[in-house]
Structure formats: structure tokens, C-alpha cells
Amino acid sequence: MPATASASPPTSPSPTASGNSDLRPEQGSAKVASKAASFTSQVDDPHYSSSHAGSVNVHGWWLDDHDNFTGMKARVTVYLWAKKGSQWVQVNKIPTKKNPVTVYAGGGGGKRASGSVSCRSHKPTWYHGQVDVDIIDAIDTSNRPNSHDVELNCQPW
């Protein structure tokens, strides 16, 4: 199930789904508006690619839950993190053809960003995804929700 986060600013920083709050920018960023309209940022859990054998993928998208942004697009960027020792390391390359993308709300093919990394060995490695959604020409928060941590037999180094 995808991780979700409301774009309405919280009153205090909350932990991320993966417990790695150090990867999320602070909630008090200058981009945050007290009356920002809400939308939902979503990121799926890292998983083996069904179209490119030997790689791990993560996808991010956004939903306009209350029709606040009808006809508007957002720039969606996904980050794929792998744990190396005690540190989380970003392993996907940005920019690519599919990341970031500027898309309408909805998710699915053509409405989401995709990040991936190739496996160099089959050693167990922890991964998590992160998504950043920026509505074009609108004020939104700097939230970057994380997926769950997932252990996969794919080491990227």
C-alpha cells in the first residue's frame, strides 16, 4: 500500500513512515503556507521491476482529493534510498526521462515519476522511496513522504 501525506502543514514535524525523519526537510520551510489547499503525495514501496529484470523501482504521484487543483500539473520527483552500513544513500539518478515529471493528478501510467537502480549482486539490502510533489504555480508544503523500508535481494554497489 502506498505511503501518503497530506499537503496541509502539520503543527509539528511528524516522523516518516520509515522512521527516517532526517531525510525529510523541516516542516517550517518558507514554502509552507498556513492556508495551503490539500492534496495527497503518494509513493509506493520499492519493489523488483516487472519490466527491467535485475533492478529495483519506486514510483511517486499525487492525488487532488478535493478538486483544489483541477487542470493543474505538478512536478513529481522520486528518490530511491538504499542503506549502506548505517547510512541511507540515494541510489537513483536524477534527472532521467521519467524523473522528475510534470503531470496531472492521478497516478498510473503517464501520471507518475519512476526511480530505479540496477542490482550488482543479490545481497540483501534495505530500501525506501521518497516523493516530492510541487504543484506548478501554487503554494504547497515541503513534505517528502517516505515509503516503508523494504529488504530486497539487490545490492546496487
Give the ranges of each region predicted by the language model:
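Post-signal peptide N-terminal regions of Sec-secreted extracellular proteins
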Residues: 10-157
